[in-house]
C-alpha cells in the first residue's frame, strides 16, 4: 500500500527461500530501490521473515494474518468442531478495541480448555497478541490490514499462468513471466482503484508525534 492508498507491487525475486538471509536480502533490495516509511508488514508465521523484519525494519510493526492464524489453530481441532471454534476466533477480532479483543481471547482460551482442546487453547494464548497489531491503526483500516488477502489476487494469477506453462527452462524465464503478470494485474482495478483512505493514518501519526 503506497502513501496515497493504492495497492502497489514493490518487487519480485527468483528462487527466494523462507530463511532470514533470503528475506534480509530481499528487503534490502527494496530499500535500495527507494522503499521507505514502512509502517506495517502483514504476513504469516514465517520465522525467517519475522527475524528479517526486526533487523531491516526495526521501527515497523508486524501483523500476523488472522486467516493463517485461524488455520494454524484449526490444525489441532477435530473437524467436527472447526465451525464452532471459527466463530469463537472471529469473535476475538470483532471487538472494538485491542483491550476488548484481549479480554475476549482470554475467555476463548478458557472455553477451549473446557472443550478439552488444550492444544488449540495454547496456540490462541501464545499467538493472539501478534494478530492484534491492526488495532493500533485507524478503525476503518482494520479489515484491510489484519490479513494478507490483498496479495491473494496476485498469487492466484501467478499460479494460473505458471500452471499453463508447466515447466520453465530456467529461473529467469519463470521470473519474467511472473513479472509480466504482476505488471498486468497492477494495471487493472487491483492497482488503479483506491484501497484505503490514508488521511486517517496520517492524522493518527501526527497525533502520536504531537503527544511525544
Predicted feature locations:
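Residue-level signal for pocket-adjacent positions within structured domains
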Residues: 8, 60, 68-72, 140, ...
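A detector of single, family-specific signature residues
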Residues: 3, 13-23, 27, 31-32, ...
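A generic short alpha-helical patch detector that favors 3-5-residue windows
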Residues: 15-19, 41, 62-65, 77-81, ...
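Acidic/histidine-rich catalytic cores and adjacent linkers
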Residues: 91-212
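RNase H-like nuclease fold core
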Residues: 1-42, 47, 51, 56-59, ...
